[in-house]
Amino acid sequence: MRIGMISPYSLTIPGGVQNQILSLARALRNKGIDVRVLGPCDGPPPDTGITPLGNSLPTATNGSIAPLAPDPSAQLRLIRALRDERFDLLHVHEPLAPGPVITAIVLKQSPIVATFHRSGPSKSYEYFNKPARWVANRVEVNCAVSEEAAVTARNALGGDYEILFNGIELDRYSLKVPKQAKRSIFFVGRHEPRKGLEVLIRSMRFLPDEVKLWIASDGPDTKRLQKATEDDIRIEWLGRISEEEKIERLQKCSLFCAPSLGGESFGIVLLEAMASGALVVASDIPGYSKLTRGGKDALLFKAGDSTALAKALEKGLYEPWASQ
């Protein structure tokens, strides 16, 4: 069987959906299935078996900025690839994202499986409901990565959704060396209000001087937050880092913090952190609380509350059970 897996987002820019697509493709190949990933790439493809569809364009979506490829040149590259590859099955992710995914569904040269990742209200689902339903009706099997994602899709489009949770490649994250950085907190995610980075930075005011904070990635809030924290030597700004460095940091840090304010349907990075041996401190939002079994597998705090976050971080860093 030959499967074409289509990403709406740039595969060279870190993101939960992109990581899931690349990991799933590798897992299927290990089972002897021929998989090719098609998607935008802003630079050399990050893995083998990828057909680049050109550069991405920053596009506002779900309270964030996504690296999509809605331009005509990307659609022409996709059409050419579908014609040449002749896939037996297409697996599209975020089926209503502008760009190659919708193009593939409209053309429909093979049976289609679609996976919905996003959760929460969507203006595009609301404004373009009729054409969105037409597109969705061309899909044979609809999947969602969480109940929240399924509810979002069902409310907008109707239909049935099989919930297939995200997964990770455990061997890549398993802790191979002892923890090396005591009293260290790691954050990775786009620097924008929805991800709650500013809440985390405010919480540092309540923590002892020995606590270190590593901040990876970048975004529209980066320069402002760097300026506001330029006198705090405890905070290290890492910029965009490779997947390998992300895993290394997860394995070295004392705890991983996910302070998102909302809009998270699953939170795969929490799985990555737990698999790496890091304690997780996360906001008490549906996408995180269900993943952590109501807080049994993480310390949860009220989203947006920097004081509550500081208390959770201090508990994770200093109470004996947290290091076990």
Language-model region placement:
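Conserved donor-binding/catalytic core segment of Leloir-type glycosyltransferases
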Residues: K176-P208, L213-W214
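Carbohydrate-associated surface elements
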Residues: C41, E148, G167
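Membrane-proximal helix-turn-helix segments that form the acceptor-binding/catalytic region
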Residues: G120-N142, A149, N155-A156
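Short hydrophobic beta-strand element within catalytic cores of glycosyltransferases
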Residues: L279-A282
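N-terminal strand-loop element at the rim of the active site
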Residues: I6-P14, I21-P72, R80-A81, G219-P220
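Conserved acidic donor-binding segment of nucleotide-sugar-dependent glycosyltransferases
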Residues: G294-G295, L299-S306, K315-W321
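Nucleotide-activated donor-binding/catalytic signature segment of Leloir-type glycosyltransferases, i.e.
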Residues: K223-I247
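Acidic anion/phosphate-binding donor-loop and adjacent secondary structure
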Residues: V151-R154, F165-R183
